[in-house]
Curated annotation (Swiss-Prot):
Functional pathway: Cell wall biogenesis; peptidoglycan biosynthesis
Residues given in the record as UDP-N-acetyl-alpha-D-glucosamine binding sites: 13-15, 124, 165, 193, 294
GO cellular component: plasma membrane
GO-annotated biological processes: carbohydrate metabolic process; cell division; cell wall organization; lipid glycosylation; peptidoglycan biosynthetic process; regulation of cell shape
Homology family: Belongs to the glycosyltransferase 28 family. MurG subfamily.
Record-linked Pfam families: Glyco_tran_28_C, Glyco_transf_28
Enzymatic reactions: di-trans,octa-cis-undecaprenyl diphospho-N-acetyl-alpha-D-muramoyl-L-alanyl-D-glutamyl-meso-2,6-diaminopimeloyl-D-alanyl-D-alanine + UDP-N-acetyl-alpha-D-glucosamine = di-trans,octa-cis-undecaprenyl diphospho-[N-acetyl-alpha-D-glucosaminyl-(1->4)]-N-acetyl-alpha-D-muramoyl-L-alanyl-D-glutamyl-meso-2,6-diaminopimeloyl-D-alanyl-D-alanine + UDP + H(+)
Name of this protein: UDP-N-acetylglucosamine--N-acetylmuramyl-(pentapeptide) pyrophosphoryl-undecaprenol N-acetylglucosamine transferase
Domain of life where this protein originates: Bacteria
GO MF annotations in UniProt: UDP-N-acetyl-D-glucosamine:N-acetylmuramoyl-L-alanyl-D-glutamyl-meso-2,6-diaminopimelyl-D-alanyl-D-alanine-diphosphoundecaprenol 4-beta-N-acetylglucosaminlytransferase activity; undecaprenyldiphospho-muramoylpentapeptide beta-N-acetylglucosaminyltransferase activity
Length: 374
């Protein structure tokens, strides 16, 4: 018999959906039924999501200064809140948990107005706009990188870490095996769940600048956006090297486990997954993020020695080639970075978050939960 329904709400990108998925697996193991509220984009990432049902509720971003666009967005949000209210009244969840992104706004607002227990999980070191708007209303906040002191919402924040998917936990069981000079070197390049055009342009040029011996060692996995596939594939073909190029890899966890070096953006899920698996990384924060959240996430891992942070403006193809030339012949350095990243990882984040969800659903305060955790 189910302990009750937990309604998870997540924006439709991998960065929001993946940690919600990890929590969903834990809650199902504990006897709960899980439903997901999201938007239409999530279908790409929610294929393995263990939800009884996935509900799409209208939502919108209020980012335009155009009065007509703002009015349209407000109407969509109001419609979404009505739909979310009906959904919550029908499902009667014991708690609603939001993972960020504007699709979480209608269900979380509806939950707080209906008196249903509610909490947020913020993946980043800087709170996103949707979560920031909802934070004063919810009972508790779980943080991937948020502090438990010194912040306006610290009194109801628990630093759980970011839950990672079962595939990542399985990959974390594989030790880091360094590549010595002359041996194949696995390089994984990706820009988060939606790709990064910058890497599509920079990496082929950087690899072309390597000497023949180093280039022959490279085994590249590179995620590229669909519109960049033809360009990158053509460049790789000219280089006559081993490479897997695709818009999305369903086995990315295994590819990360095999990596000797990762070059990537620094979204919260990415940083968390790299640290749990324990792989050295060059982190290139997305430069146009409004809240500079990726820079803060990257700094957190770099402080442990598990990664090096390089702003995109400073990372030319020539510099990438120089970095690869050095680290491909310095396995000890990469091994030390891998070990430091592993120490920074929080593989038990999903269990701790599930504990917190159960406590808040049962009516406990954050202070009470912290005391029982100590």
């Amino acid at each position: 018999m189910s302990k009750g329904i937990v309604l998870l709400a997540a924006g439709g990108t991998g960065g929001h959906v993946f940690p919600a998925e990890a929590l969903a697996f834990k809650l199902k193991e504990r006897g709960y039924s899980v439903h997901l509220v999201t938007d239409s984009r999530a279908e790409r990432y929610a294929g393995k999501f263990p939800a009884e049902e996935i509900h799409v509720v209208p939502s919108a971003t209020i980012g335009s200064k155009n009065p007509v666009a703002v009015a349209r967005s407000l109407w969509t949000l109001w419609s979404g809140m009505r739909a979310a209210k009906r959904l919550i009244q029908r499902l009667k969840p014991v708690i609603v948990v939001g993972f960020g992104g504007y699709p979480t706004v209608p269900p979380l607002l509806a939950a707080t107005r209906l008196g249903v227990a509610s909490m947020l999980h913020e993946q980043n070191a800087v709170m996103g706009r949707a979560n920031k708007a909802l934070a004063p209303r919810v009972k508790a906040i779980a943080g991937g990188f948020l502090p438990e002191s010194g912040d306006v919402f610290s009194d109801k924040t628990v630093a759980t870490g970011n839950p990672v998917r079962p595939a990542i936990l399985a990959a974390a069981e594989q030790p880091y095996l360094p590549s010595h000079p002359g041996e194949p070197f696995n390089l994984v390049v990706f820009g988060g769940s939606q790709g990064a055009q910058y890497f599509s342009k920079a990496m082929p040029t950087a690899i072309s600048l390597l000497d023949d011996g180093l280039r022959a060692r490279l085994r590249v996995t590179q995620q590229v956006r669909p519109e960049d596939m033809e360009m990158v594939s053509g460049c790789v073909a000219k280089l006559e090297m081993g490479a897997d190029i695709a818009p999305f890899f369903n086995d990315m966890a295994e590819r990360l486990a095999q990596a000797h070096l990762v070059i990537c953006r620094s979204g919260a899920s990415t940083v968390s997954e790299i640290s749990v698996i324990g792989r050295p990384a060059i982190l290139v924060p997305y430069p146009h993020a409004l809240d500079h959240d990726q820079a803060a996430n990257a700094a957190a891992l770099a402080a442990t020695g598990g990664a090096k942070v390089i702003p995109q403006s400073e990372l030319s193809p020539e510099r990438i080639a120089s970095i690869l030339s050095h680290v491909m012949n310095d396995p000890d350095k990469l091994s030390h970075m891998a070990a430091a990243a592993k120490l920074a990882g929080k593989p038990d984040a999903a269990n701790l978050l599930a504990d917190m969800v159960e406590a808040i659903a049962a009516g406990k305060t954050v202070s009470e939960f912290k005391r029982t955790r100590a």
